[in-house]
């Protein structure tokens, strides 16, 4: 299963629900927001222990910082694959909750990098016909 942005969150929820009746092999999400609280994260980890799962984040994409964990207690599940640029390169791998990948940047700072949400692995998942998003650096999308 795979998804970008809210589609990534929906892929996680669907995989969790479907895993009762179907075998889920792999889950890859891109720019996914936080999905659940600590109890849900624990339940997901227990149920999906044998599923390959990676949460990919592009540089300072603000969406993975939402909703703010301090506001509602939401957390990420699974390891993070973090690209420190918006193009293909060598990613860093971080365990869930580790702040050395995208977590090193605050939500406020990431809000000035909204273009990073529509630039994954050199592709634009926000608009399939555009190779890269049209942005003004530091101001987000035009």
Range-by-range predicted roles:
Residues 1-2, 16-142:
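Serine hydrolase/lipase
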Residues 3-7, 11:
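Gly/Ala-rich beta-loop-alpha elbow adjacent to hydrolase catalytic centers
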């Amino acid at each position: 299963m795979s998804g970008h942005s809210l589609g990534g969150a929906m892929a996680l929820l669907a995989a969790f629900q479907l895993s009762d009746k179907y075998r889920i092999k792999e889950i890859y999400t891109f720019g996914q927001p936080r999905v659940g609280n600590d109890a849900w994260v624990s339940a997901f980890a227990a149920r999906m222990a044998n599923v390959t799962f990676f949460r990919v984040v592009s540089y300072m994409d603000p969406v993975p910082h939402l909703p703010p964990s301090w506001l509602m207690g939401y957390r990420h599940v699974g390891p993070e694959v973090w690209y420190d640029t918006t193009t293909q390169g060598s990613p860093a791998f971080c365990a869930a909750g580790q702040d050395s990948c995208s977590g090193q940047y605050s939500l406020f700072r990431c809000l000035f990098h909204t273009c990073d949400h529509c630039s994954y692995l050199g592709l634009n998942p926000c608009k399939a016909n555009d190779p890269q998003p049209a942005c003004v650096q530091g101001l987000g999308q035009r």
